[in-house]
């Protein structure tokens, strides 16, 4: 080598090595970032009232009075206003898929004990359709969300002393003397998909659990508290196809029983051939009424343990917690300090393929003078690897 060519060749060699290293680094970075961001949300809307007094009633008279209290509380918690705040939460996060629970449909009819004894609800006059009201707020000015699966759950109708006054029911004397109306509650679970965001859904499915809580109301009548699940296969902006499941497990069972009703329902989800058992990566959202780290009573964690034993792992933040505003009759009072445990979850059975990018808890402050729900919402942005 001459004195003039050696430095040039050394510089060329150094440049080549640097270029090779840069290419390798770029390739490694592309590989690590390979995947698609998918945004999901779980949102319990709160049906609008506490059903416990009716469930615990011991006579027909106390049952009708308790039902009247439920009707009045639904009015007081004002879903038409709460829907505005709920829509703001959802639109603020822009999830591609949303799992909704307690999407109540309230209907009414003249007072009658017939539907109680027959077990066949008959009321058709709509008082509040939570799904319709929420979609109206979400799609105001532009269609942004559509329901892809709707599943009816608990559906029950009974007479109610709606105004709380004695003796003014149209039925005159007797058991219906105080009842002005029949109230019908149809609980629903719903999956929403974002419009115009590259969300493609297929294979919608829905069903009820076979294991249900049975309660005795009015001291005699046994009713089943129907709960279930919804699911859909989806791709988002060209992502790998995945299986999205939304569910709401039992809330009123005895958590100290082993296995509890909610634990058995979780078992149905993850059983071979169950809605959360798929060859595709599964993303499950919902109100499991269960957690291990923030267990309120011994046994509360059973359902969550069933999920983790089946290979499911959390894909959402654990803090702040989101359940529940219990002290407020009308959702106008109370503090987010009451949200001291976790029951709403976002999970996956394929933690190697589904990575958590970011997560947020929504609805921990009042809007429009009301808490949006007794629950907070839960949002996660996930990276689904190809």
What are these regions (language model features)?
Residues 197-208, 233, 256, 260-263, ...:
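Metal-dependent phosphoester-hydrolase catalytic domains
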Residues 59-77, 110-125, 157-182, 203-222, ...:
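Surface-exposed intrinsically disordered loops and tails
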Residues 11-23:
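Bacterial N-terminal signal peptides
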Residues 28-171, 386:
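N-terminal, active-site-proximal structural segment of metallo-dependent hydrolase catalytic domains
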Residues 40-45, 82, 86-112, 117, ...:
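Active-site beta-strand/loop signature of hydrolases that rely on acidic residues for catalysis
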Residues 1-14:
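Bacterial N-terminal signal peptides that target proteins for export
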Residues 45-49, 103-107, 152-157, 197-198, ...:
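Solvent-exposed loop/turn segments at secondary-structure junctions
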Residues 138-140, 144-242, 246, 354-362:
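A well-ordered secondary-structure block
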């Amino acid at each position: 080598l001459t004195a003039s060519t050696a430095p040039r060749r050394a510089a060329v060699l150094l440049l080549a090595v640097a270029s090779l290293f840069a290419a390798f680094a770029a390739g490694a970075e592309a590989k690590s970032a390979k995947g698609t961001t998918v945004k999901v949300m779980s949102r319990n809307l709160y049906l609008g009232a506490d059903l416990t007094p009716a469930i615990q009633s011991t006579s027909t008279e106390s049952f009708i009075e308790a039902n009247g209290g439920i009707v009045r509380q639904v009015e007081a918690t004002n879903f038409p206003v709460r829907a505005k705040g709920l829509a703001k939460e959802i639109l603020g996060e822009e999830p591609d898929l949303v799992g909704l629970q307690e999407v109540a449909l309230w209907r009414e009819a003249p007072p009658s004990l017939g539907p109680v004894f027959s077990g066949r609800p008959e009321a058709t006059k709509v008082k509040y359709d939570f799904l319709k009201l929420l979609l109206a707020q979400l799609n105001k000015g532009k269609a942004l969300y559509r329901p892809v699966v709707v599943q009816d759950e608990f559906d029950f109708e009974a007479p109610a002393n709606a105004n709380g006054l004695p003796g003014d029911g149209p039925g005159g004397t007797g058991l219906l003397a105080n009842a002005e109306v029949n109230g019908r509650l149809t609980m629903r679970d719903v999956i929403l998909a974002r419009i115009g965001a590259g969300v493609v859904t297929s294979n919608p499915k829905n069903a009820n659990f076979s294991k249900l809580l049975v309660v005795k109301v009015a001291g005699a009548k046994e009713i089943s508290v129907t709960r279930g699940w919804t699911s859909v296969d989806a791709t988002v902006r060209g992502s790998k196809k995945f299986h999205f499941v939304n569910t709401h497990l039992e809330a009123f069972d005895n958590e100290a029983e082993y296995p509890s009703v909610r634990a058995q329902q979780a078992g149905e989800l993850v059983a071979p051939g169950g809605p959360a058992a798929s060859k595709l990566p599964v993303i499950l959202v919902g109100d499991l009424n269960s957690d291990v780290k923030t267990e309120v009573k011994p046994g509360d964690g059973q359902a969550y343990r069933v999920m983790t034993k089946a290979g499911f792992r959390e894909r959402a933040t654990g803090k702040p917690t989101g359940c529940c505003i219990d002290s407020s009759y009308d959702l106008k009072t109370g503090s987010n300090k009451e949200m001291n445990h976790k029951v709403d979850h976002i999970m996956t059975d394929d933690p190697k393929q589904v990575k958590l990018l970011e997560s947020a808890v929504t609805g921990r402050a009042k809007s429009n003078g009301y808490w949006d729900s007794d629950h907070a919402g839960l949002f996660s942005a996930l990276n689904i690897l190809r």
